[in-house]
Swiss-Prot record:
Stored Gene3D superfamilies: 2.120.10.10
Subcellular location: Virion membrane; Host apical cell membrane
Record protein name field: Neuraminidase
Positions of region (Hypervariable stalk region): 38-85
Residue numbers annotated as active site: 148, 408
UniProt note on regulation of activity: Inhibited by the neuraminidase inhibitors zanamivir (Relenza) and oseltamivir (Tamiflu). These drugs interfere with the release of progeny virus from infected cells and are effective against all influenza strains. Resistance to neuraminidase inhibitors is quite rare.
Amino acid sequence: MLPSTIQTLTLFLTSGGVLLSLYVSASLSYLLYSDILLKFSPKITAPTMTLDCTNASNVQAVNRSATKEMTFLLPEPEWTYPRLSCQGSTFQKALLISPHRFGEARGNSAPLIIREPFIACGPKECKHFALTHYAAQPGGYYNGTREDRNKLRHLISVKLGKIPTVENSIFHMAAWSGSACHDGREWTYIGVDGPDSNALIKIKYGEAYTDTYHSYANNILRTQESACNCIGGDCYLMITDGSASGISKCRFLKIREGRIIKEIFPTGRVEHTEECTCGFASNKTIECACRDNNYTAKRPFVKLNVETDTAEIRLMCTETYLDTPRPDDGSITGPCESNGDKGRGGIKGGFVHQRMASKIGRWYSRTMSKTERMGMELYVKYDGDPWTDSDALDPSGVMVSIKEPGWYSFGFEIKDKKCDVPCIGIEMVHDGGKKTWHSAATAIYCLMGSGQLLWDTVTGVDMAL
């Protein structure tokens, strides 16, 4: 279907000369597309005109002005596909969004109290998403802001680089779990809320609420807390439903223009998979590094074939264990599928691909502390298979020191003109406990240049102020 973006070029021809008038209606954002359809419709008008003549009594003058209208219909933008990554061999500190450095502001300029931030990008812009408690700091509604789920939480966004304040934020839907992605034409927003025993996934495409998906295990249906992934108009979303301390089997929803068109049921090691961070390894395969909150400190690793719409899960085999809490690296014996110990509890992990012509890099993040959500390091592994490679990952630098909070982390890609820039974001939580506000900053590191990762990030926030 063609969009409403129309350009009308009207050429008025008169005996006194040529008047060219260009009318542009709606948006010019799609001018980069070259296919143009032309439609001509003739119009005839007869304006009055005075003529000078020496013998005017014997002359009757008639003027005709002919109008030709040309209507330019611009086609819709293209669906997005993964491209090769932009050049680079290291990540560097790109951006810090620390809203509560502005905590003295009040009213519409006050920063929202948020958690679970993530970033998703379309062809023209990136959005910084989060789940708010419908409260700001300073304010009088701090009670309950440490809760994961309640009736006040909403999925919000700002343009990346903006501070998520009351006036800057767009409230998309009521939600205590969320995701979002851009298919090249429009945004898809995902929100989950409702009672633990009967939660509901809601889908919004652009400004329209388009579809829902009901709980299948009646135990906190939830989604990934990071961007879903789109290719050729199809967007893939990871969901799970089940006990945080037991079985929680994930599924993938295939969504097109805001409507669910298929459910995908992974095979393999499916006991517990949640909070997946996913991205494209190629035009054929989505890969996800996920969280097992009950059985192991290894990350469940998903491979989803978008040509066959099939998915399989196995544990990562590397001796660098990526969850928190975790045992000492290399201490788990036995085959790759061995769970090991210290598997209770967990944290969402950052993961992003570096797609190159001759090889692929997989970048991961994990906390510096083995037991606490403190600090964040970056790791990389080129080529190989995460299911079978037992070698250690290569450390690539400290993004957050062990003295600073490092909670959830996630991956995303910024779209340059001809390539994609892989990035990792880190949630740095201000944990005020149950007696005061509980919110987060976001640190962002992206692939750029060469050398070594140079500097870590601090929030600069003192909750006692």
